[in-house]
Amino acid sequence: RALLDEFPNVAIMRTFSKAYGLANYRVGYMMTPLELANYMQTIRLPYNLNTLSQVAAEAAFDDQEFLARTVSQNAEERTKWESLFDELGIHYYKSEANFIFFASPDAEGLADAWLKSGYQVRRGQREGWLRLTIPMPQDGDIMRKILRDFMN
């Protein structure tokens, strides 16, 4: 909130895609000074949010217990990945998000190994690097085993 009071050109945006589990609904919100919000209203598309998405977002926003569990689970799983990367000497960028960006000597080979088991990671953002979206714990266990096997 302090940033919004201090800077008239700041917009803070949040998505419901990740922690709220509403990726297909394409819904989020923005906090910004009134003048910028009024301008955004003039350029947004009409009917940019359908009723189903709005109802789902409102229900998700009301379920703060679910959000807290999701954020906690994500943090625990991210810590497991960071520990494994440290153990294997894999360079990565620390993250508070639901993904980790990391280097691999054979990024394409590793991505293919995961893909053969049904897991996709984001490729091509930087040569030799992959972006791993933090998976559910049971999938994370399988993916970490694949990574260990791949690195040995």
Predicted regions and their residues:
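Glycine-enriched alpha-helix->loop->beta-strand junction motifs that scaffold or abut catalytic
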Residues: 7-10, 118
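Short amphipathic alpha-helical segments
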Residues: 25, 96-98, 128-130
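Short, glycine/charged-enriched secondary-structure capping and boundary segments
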Residues: 1-2, 26-28, 147
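PLP-dependent enzyme catalytic core of the Aspartate aminotransferase-like
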Residues: 108, 113-117, 122-152
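Conserved PLP-binding catalytic core of the aspartate aminotransferase-like
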Residues: 74-75, 83-117, 134
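PLP-dependent aminotransferase class I/II
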Residues: 9-85, 90-93
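Conserved core of the PLP fold type I
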Residues: 1-6, 57
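Short loop segments at secondary-structure junctions
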Residues: 32-36, 104-107, 137
